[in-house]
Amino acid sequence: MARRTEFTVLVGTDGSPSARAAIAAAAMFPWPRNARVHAVVARQEAGAGAPRKRSGVTNQPDERIVTRTRRALARRWPDAEVTLVDKPPAEAILDAARRLGAAAVCVGWRGHGGFRRLLMGSVSREVVRHAACPVLVVRRRPRHLRAFLVGVDGSLNARRAVTFLSRLHPPTGGRTTIVRVVEPVGLQSAGLLPGGIRGTLRREVAALNAERIAKAERDVEKAASQLRRAGWRVRTSVRSGEPLTELLATAAETKAHVLVVGARGARGLSRVLLGSVAEGSLTHSPVPVLVAR
């Protein structure tokens, strides 16, 4: 188990382009100054019990992946550890995260075992769903990792996302945008009601929506204060609409390099491992997604 004073980052890799992008992102990410990294390479394909054989790369030994991974990470961490294990990838990553007491896990969006027609690899999905710490999922190699967008909704996981960002070391030029999306309350079948009642209900609904927006503004300012104290430049935004749609639109408008979401929102069921906004972000976001819990 890692010492509590350390911030351990675990990187899972299988040598795929997506995994190499995750390694590059891990080396660029603004982790705390005391961060250490450990990478794990699994010998087995996801769901297989025999040593891995990958289409098109059967002559690439696992030891070469270990060497390349260590070399890439050594640019930031000269003492980076890379472990080769005989386990399916998701199991290897989750086991290592528990053993090391990882503060964060970094994985590629889809590895060698995935099919091109699948939206997201089974390994990254399983890691995101079952890891006890935040998971950074990387689709392609980023050029910069300075602009963050964090979606908040009042949930415990959203607050944990803000706290996680406050632990990072803000990079030069680093900025964070905090966005809260309020789904407006509307009237259904109001046209069937008498005019006087319809007008009263509309005023009440308008007042309710205004109250919810005011609360959202207070919530984002509270989160912004926490990040400003940690050294981040912060902007806030409260939007009205469907949460995932507005979150992705804000990410595009702000040119975010990283999208940060809670694993499950305020309305998520406790038995659900991953909420709809987190799932949608992982599926549709072109930039790395950090799922916090």
Model-derived features: where do they sit?
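Structural signature of PLP-dependent enzymes
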Residues: 205-212
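Gly/Ser-rich helix-loop-strand patches that form or flank binding pockets
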Residues: 1-7, 23, 28-32, 94-143, ...
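Phosphate/nucleotide-donor binding subsite
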Residues: 67-79
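Short, surface-exposed alpha-helical segments at coil->helix boundaries
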Residues: 55, 59-70, 213-221
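A short, acidic, amphipathic alpha-helical segment used as a generic capping/interface helix at domain edges
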Residues: 221-225, 243-252
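Small/aliphatic-rich secondary-structure junction motif
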Residues: 2-59, 76-80, 143-203, 226-230, ...
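Charged docking surfaces used in two-component/phosphorelay signaling
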Residues: 84-92, 238-246
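Well-ordered alpha-helical segments embedded in enzymatic catalytic cores
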Residues: 22-25, 92, 161, 219, ...
